[in-house]
Amino acid sequence: MDTISVVSTLSFSDELLDRLRAVSPRLVVMQQTASSADELPAGWWDRVEVLYTGSALPDPARAPRLRWVQMHSAGVDHVQDTPLWRSDVAVTTSSGIHAPNIAEYVLAMMLAFSRRLPRMLACQARAEWPSQRWEKFAAPELRRATVGVMGYGSIGREVGRLAHAFGMRVLGLRRSAGTGRPPEFELPELAGRPGAEPDAVFTPDRLAEMLPACDYVVLALPHTPATYHFINEAALRAMKPSALLVNIG
């Protein structure tokens, strides 16, 4: 029976690896944490056909049997200027699976700063409790605030859904002003859930119109030549002085 060698350069539990092995008796699954191709045993590159990795990207000449690279990340900007990208090896991403995790992070940051948690933690570290607590810790609610989500893919949609649950107004920035196409991949538990669509849609040429209306701005754009320096000095100056920028791109 022909086998298929699968290598993971990220650390997964034995339970998860055994679940992968159970897919087919042909799979030979090997794992070693590595951030570069040089950190893996040389003999592995002669065998590997499927690679799961974050940044350990071999030259295809070094891995003659390699057919498929599954990236741990949603973006591939760090792959595009490599021999691997220019080869016939298939490269796929994890776009879509991070939506709940990253959206919760965004809401956590918005809540932390609106509720003055950094100030509270600083006082705690100094073992002090200010007498003017109201002036120091009074917090605006997320409810009725406006959040602008730049990049309305799977993560942006989930940010919008959670923001709506907090009673926020959601502005979405995407390439076209239509209703938008569904993400190429969406977790089954998120698909079709209400509240994901923004209250208003802006295209990139209307960025200067959207930013002044936002109390919070979420930067969820992929890193591409078109988005490089998309948020520049002019964009920052267009924002409210009190606005919070959360960058998860």
Name each region found by the language model:
Residues 177-249:
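Rossmann-like adenosine-cofactor binding region
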Residues 9, 54, 72, 220-223, ...:
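Short, well-ordered coil/turn residues at beta-beta hairpins
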Residues 11-14, 36, 53-58, 74-76, ...:
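Short, polar loop motifs at secondary-structure junctions
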Residues 1-50, 179-181:
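N-terminal glycine-/charge-rich "phosphate-binding" loop or analogous flexible N-terminal tail
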Residues 171:
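Conserved beta-strand positions in the Rossmann-like core of class I SAM-dependent methyltransferases
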Residues 47-125, 139-140:
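Phosphate/diphosphate ligand-binding glycine-rich loop within oxidoreductases
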Residues 121-158, 197:
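Glycine-rich NAD(P)-binding loop of Rossmann-like domains
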Residues 3, 88, 143-146, 242:
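Phosphate-coordination loops involved in phosphoryl transfer and adenosine-cofactor binding
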